[in-house]
Structure formats: C-alpha cells, structure tokens
C-alpha cells in the first residue's frame, strides 16, 4: 500500500493508529469494575504535562491498523469496547463504531472533547483539559464528566466545566496519580461539601492490571 492510499484510508477512518488493545477491568468512573475491551489509539496534541501515556502522542509511531482487524479482536473478547488514547476524536470514529454496532458491541469513548464528535456512542466520558478546551457541542452529549485534579486550581476548572454539561451527566473528580497522596484528602473533603461530585480512582493501578 502506497502512502497516498494509506493516508486516504486513515482520513476515512478505515485505518487507525493502534497503540495497543487489551481486555481488562475498567478502572475509572461510572463503569469501574466492569469488563471491557480497550482500544488505545495514537495521536494527541492536548499535551497534558502529567499524562501517563505520552508515548501515545505521536500517531506515526503506531501502526495503521484496519478497523476490521481491530473489531475482530473485540468480538473475540467482549461485548463492550472503550476507545481511548491519545485523543481518539482526532480520527473519524464513524466507520469503526458502525462496524462495532453491526456486531452488537456497546461503544464507549474517553475523550478530551477537543475535536468534533464523530461516531455512534453508548457512553461518552468527557475529560476536559485546560491546554485545549472541548468544543462546545460535545458538552451536551457527555454521559460522564471526569475531571483530573492535579492542584487546587483544577477544582475551579472542574466547577466551571460542570456548568456546561447536562443535568443528567455524572460528575467525577479523579486525583492525578502522581499527586494522589496530596490531593486525595482535598478531593474527599470537597466531595463531602459538594455532593453533586463523586470520587473516581484509578483502581486498575491499585490492582496492577492494564
């Protein structure tokens, strides 16, 4: 396949830069504790300094993979898929979610919301970042708002973002892993005073699973 053909297939969402895929237990937010197949796509320009998967940022370092091959692996393992990154909405998600739907797979996405929403989703976890704010139209679509808390200023940012989502959207505060011992007491106290929020933990890291 020549580079022009490959680029055309990537632009159409028929090839995606696959960093990794694995079957595991979801560790964060509303669906924590439930089994799901994860698809981690390469490519992200949001640039969070505390990102724990910076190797995902450069999409060119990850193989362009057919969505048919990706979905085939999903079908063998689970009836629920979580597409994450990187920032998956850098790519057209419509073809892969169509194929997943045709195979009765529930579709979840984890996104910063910095790019236009594409694809057909059962669950949208929106995790806004200060470096590159979400586009306005995605807020009303979010089922879950997950705010990563690195310092006290992030609580102000979280409150501001919570005003933009629908009243049915679930609200979570999650400590940034490297600062968890410092910020967890702050988050716990904040949630007790502001019970519209819930605490999210990266339980997969405590369990030492992917």
Predicted regions mapped to residue ranges:
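Intrinsically disordered, low-complexity peptide-like regions
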Residues: 2-3, 141
């Amino acid at each position: 396949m020549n580079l022009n053909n490959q680029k055309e297939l990537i632009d159409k969402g028929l090839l995606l830069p696959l960093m990794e895929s694995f079957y595991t237990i979801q560790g964060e937010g509303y669906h924590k504790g439930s089994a799901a197949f994860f698809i981690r796509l390469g490519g992200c320009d949001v640039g969070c300094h505390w990102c724990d998967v910076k190797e995902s940022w450069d999409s060119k370092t990850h193989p362009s993979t057919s969505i048919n091959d990706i979905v085939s692996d999903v079908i063998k393992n689970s009836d629920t898929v979580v597409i994450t990154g990187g920032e998956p909405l850098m790519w057209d998600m419509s073809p892969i979610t169509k194929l997943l739907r045709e195979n009765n797979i529930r579709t979840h996405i984890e996104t910063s919301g910095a790019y236009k929403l594409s694809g057909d989703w059962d669950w949208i976890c929106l995790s806004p970042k200060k470096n590159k704010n979400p586009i306005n139209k995605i807020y009303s679509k979010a089922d879950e708002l997950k705010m990563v808390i690195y310092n006290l200023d992030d609580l102000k940012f979280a409150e501001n973002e919570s005003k933009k989502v629908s009243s049915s959207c679930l609200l979570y505060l999650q400590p940034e892993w490297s600062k968890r011992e410092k910020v967890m007491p702050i988050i716990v106290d904040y949630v007790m005073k502001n019970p519209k929020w819930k605490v999210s933990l990266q339980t997969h890291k405590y369990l030492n699973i992917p």
